Amino acid sequence: MREILPGIFTWGSTYADRPWDLNGYAIALHGCTVLVDPPAPEEGDWTSFDVLKQIAKIVLTNRDHVRDTKVFQTRYGAHLVAGTDEVTQLAPLVIDEPVRESDLVADALRVIHLPGKSPGEIGLYIDPAHHAVSRELGGILILGDAIIGHPPGALGLIPEQKLDNPAKLKLSLRKLLDYNFSVLLLCDGQPVLKDGKFKVGEFLNTLANY
């Protein structure tokens, strides 16, 4: 696990059937840590997690990003957070905190509902009003499967056959431009550490042509 930004850590796993890395994030907040879409610890390195502030919540952005959540939940007793419309999609996993558009998770992470890949997919905007690092960097956005960092150095969508409603997803992605952000942390593929909103805007313009 490495510190990708001050107080924000990332780690990942590689799978033979995926041409991109699967990333998890740990966000250190006042009094607790929130995990997002956690894959297995690299080489079983639990020490890096044990030294963090209390891991109080695990956010699942969508039904396909459960990954190693149960292992983390068992070890740390964290509550599970997911979009309200994704709760049934995640069964039999029990979601402790269903969230909707604009809800605030752990007093810092603003929920963005992004349906299309699945009914209740969410993104997280680290609200600059509640987070000093996000404020200093011009905003931080975290996405699960709504947009991925593949091919390397570019943005893309997961294969269309895995999308419930491609047209709905493309429409819902437009709301990302309502937020100010420079950093784009992706749970699939390479993150974008500067000019994130500009690159998302460029990507969405290419989608409009299809």
Predicted regions and their residues:
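Structural motif
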Residues: 3, 17, 47-51, 106, ...
